[in-house]
Amino acid sequence: MHISISLLFLGSVGLLLQAQSPSADLILVNGKVLTVDAKDSIAEAVAISHGKITAVGSNEEIRKLAAKDAQVIDLHGRTATPGLIDSHCHFQEAAVLYDVEVSDPGIKRISDVLDRVQAKVASLKPGAWVRGSGWDEGKFAELRYIYASDLDQVAPNNPVWLEHTTGHYGVANSAALKLAGVTRETKDPPAGTIDRDSSGQPTGVLKESAQNLVRHLIPPYTHEQRRNGLLRIMADFNKEGMTAVKNPGIEAEEWDLYQELLKEKKLSVRIFALWLGGTSTSSAREALQHIARLPKPPQSFDGLLLSGGVKIFMDGSGGGRTAWMYQDWNKGSTGKDTGNRGYPNTPPDAYREMVHMIHGAGVHVSTHAIGDRAIDWVVDTYDQVLKEKPTKGLRHGIIHCNTPTDHAIETMARLEKEYDAGYPELQAPFMWWIGDNYAGNLGPDRVQRLTPLKTFLARGIVWGGGSDYPVTPFPARYGIWASIERKTLKSVYGLQPFGTAEAVDVHTALRSYTAWAARRLFLEDNVGSIEPGKDADIAVWDRDLYSVPSDELRDLKCELTLLRGRVVYQAPGSPVAMR
């Protein structure tokens, strides 16, 4: 039974639940509980039995529901929320530590990256690969790409591949380009770009599918490396009050590792896995073959692992100016990247055929679409297949959905209402972490359309919040903050080039990383709010999200995380602990 409790009705509802609920084996008391239920109710305490929430109410009422041997967590006035959910995170991909990590704030200029590459090279034999991730030209003092000529200075005898923070482009040194056979005569592959200097010589920067010219040569990580990385990233998520994630683009190897950890009872984060559908009907068909053997959501493995659907690509990156737009990309905000409107990563007609195939199989699909033209194509495709085969509840999504047109917004609103489909899966931290790049590439006429949360809300569109980690840092507190503040990291084009007209309040921002995100994972009956009948996925914070200045939200510290009533993170030194 799902019962929402407001402070005005704690007494009567508490007595009702006492008569109908089993004795609680765990209670949380003396806190401020932000339930994120339909009424946004606030309570003091929570009763839990066998990992399920049985009551929410006042301290007095919840203590009456506790069994004699119940464990008690005194919140000491701290604030509890539902466990936070990331609706788009490359969980397993990011779980493996790269040899060279260059995404942290200590990287100020290209020479800082080169220092780390040089240090890694010193530990390797000549010919061994150096791989890294996380660079972003928008954070460099030089405001330019890293080139092969830069890397050659510190790694003349070792092939190097450094992936951009977006994952949509990267840079190889000359040794890697030589192994890949990339020369000035090499043609751009379909849906890819080999960046070249004014003489036509490759610079080392490879975009979209061109990355595969080098990436396929890099030795894969071992099973043990991937397993250890996954255990580590789950612990890191729990430390940030996070308990569920939608992992896009997995393949059989990744699914098998999830199954392995599930059997060993080592999953401390719920996983909704989207299978990689690629950019062709054959790759989408292969994904469907895997999915056909597994339960469809909301059915799952022990409530912790779901085989959720298929991810496919429509276009590229806003950071790399490869996303498919109606008008030319800008360059440096007021300049023009003349003739460059990006391009579809999947041929548009092939994409439409793929969606027909996936939808026809009764399977959920989420599509990567960043550019306005790409988003229009995606929502029109969803509209077409849903009219041809009306199916409610597959919840087809638009990943990123950065620059939607008015047409796209109206179509999404209608699809959500009529078919429970067409949901944006948004990354508010884009505005912060890679926002300077976006502001420069979109230009002053389009920049305030980025991630239009307030417009979505006004049209009745709900979305799931996410990070796209490792594109941006994964803690959901950053996404909650960015949804409200819309500030960039370095203020290259001003502190708030995206404006504040599309900002939302903290209640909406929190809901996008809890109740609404749970719906994107088909788990809204299990998690996403603190209500009787749901699993006790709960995070406890050092301050009240609803009352602190919004700029403090990115500094939130998690003190305790529960997954089904089990402690999966306890902050050292915190008084909030199981007693």
Predicted regions and their residues:
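Acyl-CoA/ACP chain-elongation machinery
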Residues: 402
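Bacterial N-terminal signal peptides
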Residues: 2-16
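His/Asp/Glu-enriched, well-ordered alpha-helical/loop segment
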Residues: 355-366, 373-396, 406, 417-422, ...
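Catalytic cores of alpha/beta
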Residues: 407-412
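Extracellular/periplasmic ectodomains of large secreted or surface enzymes and adhesion receptors
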Residues: 570-579
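Short, charged, surface-exposed secondary-structure boundary motifs
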Residues: 83, 281-285, 434-438, 492, ...
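Short beta-strand segments in beta-sandwich/barrel cores
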Residues: 32-34, 51-54, 519, 538-539, ...
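Divalent metal-binding segments
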Residues: 22-29, 34, 38-292, 299, ...
